[in-house]
């Protein structure tokens, strides 16, 4: 029997049956991506992006390789028009598009923004025509033709959408599509506006339209039934050559098709190329999350925190042997890193690997004791982070590195219209070192001063702050993860609890530095030890 899975060298590990099923299907070699994070994505409830935010996201999308960026809806407001104009004037390689209703006034607003193209929409389903627009099908057709012709007469690339297209009769869709094609429409989009298609139906629906039009087709799918990505891919099988999507699946109601899932689905399942640099996906996802204030769910496909995280002992053992055992792709392909989480389901391999990451090696019996403590801790409902695991490890072996670095003095100054400045004196193996640095805030200044006193080779890889109690005098917990520029394998953790965020951060840094210092000395030769830092 032919195996269902072969280990490829592409870094993507999917079933061979996909290729067998779709080998006879005619599909495009490449698909364009229209990203509408700045328009449909911004319509996510409680999201409002400034012009500066839109430019930042547009630049990131451009660098990632997005073909078309739908920058906004200029007629909506002066601020929106300003944002679209600023994106259009940013010198990006991507085609910059503006959304317009089938109205000359909307198109004029887009023209004032100097965009490359417009995406014109007009609802065509019976419910929209009768209940919302209160116009006939003939009037809708004529409005569509007039809008497309107006855009073309003004030198714009025009993409047209029959809003609520998947609930519009195919006969009427064909009438509208034929009419706008005759006046020069460049692309036709098929929107599943309220996410009501199944993938099989979407493929056939797009294929029917494909038979009646000559211009390129796009699809635009919403996630009301959780089918947006599947329907987007299904539309490509039916003949679409462009997909509308948003970063992290942002959008109205349940959201839109997620760009990262669409792109990886096209590549992994159908070997269809896009211009997207997939290694930038995780960065762009984080940027969009930060600027919109919408957190990415931990179990989100491709870019979620847990997408390449493993806790189960069986899974960890498998992944340590070969990543393809429990991962469908290499994490670095999408800009992620594999992580092992220690918890209730962990086995020796996971705990051993995590402790080894921070330079702590234990005997088999000691490791079993650590695992037993970890499981007991987890079963009581507590989450064990890396710093706490490290503390358990040191407790089991009965040693903790003697601190070579001691904080002797620390001062920080900050205030309104005053550049935050920090000064530290660190005693390192009996020698006092003083350093002063500025920063964007008191914590940044303090971290910079500590690094200057010890070594510029220190890298603050992670900083995590959590409030333990409530109120203005709440206790806080700071955890830092430090690395070394000269040796990527050297990592350490520091953790501290206190009522002052700045001093607690400094204490965590000093603890982390002591552990990093000890690890550095362990791998240095005798000659190098005195100049380790």
Locate each region found by the language model.
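Catalytic alpha/beta core domains of metabolic enzymes, predominantly
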Residues: 197, 201-321
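A mid-to-C-terminal "edge-of-domain" accessory segment
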Residues: 2-37, 266, 270-436, 472-475
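N-terminal capping/small domains of soluble enzymes
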Residues: 1-104, 339-342, 346-348, 352
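Short beta-alpha connecting loops at secondary-structure transitions
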Residues: 93, 129, 192, 244-252, ...
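Alpha/beta enzyme core
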Residues: 2-7, 43-68, 82-90, 104-217, ...
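Mixed-charge, glycine-accented linear interaction segment located at domain edges/termini
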Residues: 488-493, 497-526, 530
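Non-catalytic terminal/interface segments that mediate subunit docking, oligomerization
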Residues: 20-24, 30, 43-44, 48, ...
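Short, ordered loop/turn segments at secondary-structure junctions
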Residues: 73-74, 101-102, 122-125, 163-165, ...
């Amino acid at each position: 029997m032919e195996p269902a899975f072969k280990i490829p060298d592409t870094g993507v590990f999917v079933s061979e049956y996909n290729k067998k099923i779709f080998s006879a299907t005619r599909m495009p070699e490449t698909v364009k991506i229209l990203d509408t994070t700045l328009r449909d994505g911004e319509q996510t409830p409680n999201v409002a992006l400034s012009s500066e935010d839109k430019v930042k996201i547009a630049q990131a999308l451009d660098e990632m390789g997005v073909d078309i960026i739908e920058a906004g809806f200029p007629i909506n407001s002066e601020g929106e028009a300003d944002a679209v104009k600023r994106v259009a004037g940013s010198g990006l390689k991507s085609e910059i598009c503006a959304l317009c209703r089938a109205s000359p006034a909307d198109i004029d607003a887009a023209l004032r923004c100097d965009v490359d193209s417009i995406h014109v929409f007009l609802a065509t389903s019976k419910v929209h025509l009768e209940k919302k627009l209160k116009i006939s099908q003939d009037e809708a057709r004529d409005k569509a033709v007039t809008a497309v012709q107006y855009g073309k007469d003004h030198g714009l690339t025009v993409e047209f959408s029959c809003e609520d297209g998947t609930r519009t009769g195919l006969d009427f869709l064909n009438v509208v599509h034929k009419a706008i094609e005759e006046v020069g429409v460049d692309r036709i989009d098929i929107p599943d506006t309220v996410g009501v298609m199944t993938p099989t139906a979407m493929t056939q629906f797009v294929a029917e339209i494909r038979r009646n039009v000559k211009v390129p087709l796009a699809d635009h799918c919403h996630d009301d039934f959780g089918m947006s990505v599947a329907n987007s891919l299904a539309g490509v099988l039916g003949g679409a050559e462009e997909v509308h999507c948003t970063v992290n699946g942002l959008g109205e109601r349940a959201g839109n098709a997620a760009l990262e899932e669409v792109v990886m689905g096209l590549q992994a399942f159908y070997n269809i190329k896009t211009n997207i640099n997939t290694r930038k996906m995780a960065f762009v996802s984080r940027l969009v999350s930060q600027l919109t204030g919408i957190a990415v769910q931990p179990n989100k496909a491709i870019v979620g925190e847990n997408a390449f995280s493993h806790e189960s002992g069986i899974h960890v053992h498998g992944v340590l042997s070969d990543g393809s055992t429990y991962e469908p792709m290499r994490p670095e392909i999408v800009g992620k890193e594999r992580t092992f989480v220690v918890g209730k389901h962990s086995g020796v391999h996971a705990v051993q690997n995590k402790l080894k990451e921070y330079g702590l090696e234990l005997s088999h019996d000691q490791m079993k004791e650590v695992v037993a403590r970890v499981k007991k801790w987890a079963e009581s409902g507590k989450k064990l982070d890396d710093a706490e695991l490290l503390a358990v490890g040191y407790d089991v072996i009965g040693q903790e590195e003697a601190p070579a670095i001691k904080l002797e003095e620390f001062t920080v100054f900050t205030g309104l219209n005053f550049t935050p400045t920090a000064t530290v004196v660190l005693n390192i193996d009996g020698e006092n070192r003083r350093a002063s640095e500025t920063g964007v805030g008191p914590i940044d200044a303090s971290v910079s001063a500590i690094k200057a006193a010890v070594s510029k080779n220190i890298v603050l890889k992670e900083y995590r702050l959590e409030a333990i109690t409530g109120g203005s005098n709440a206790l806080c917990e700071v955890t830092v993860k430090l690395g070394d520029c000269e040796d990527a394998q050297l990592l350490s953790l520091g953790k501290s609890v206190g009522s002052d965020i700045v001093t607690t951060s400094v204490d965590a840094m000093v603890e982390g530095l002591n552990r990093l210092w000890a690890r550095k000395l362990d791998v240095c030769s005798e000659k190098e030890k005195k100049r380790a830092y």
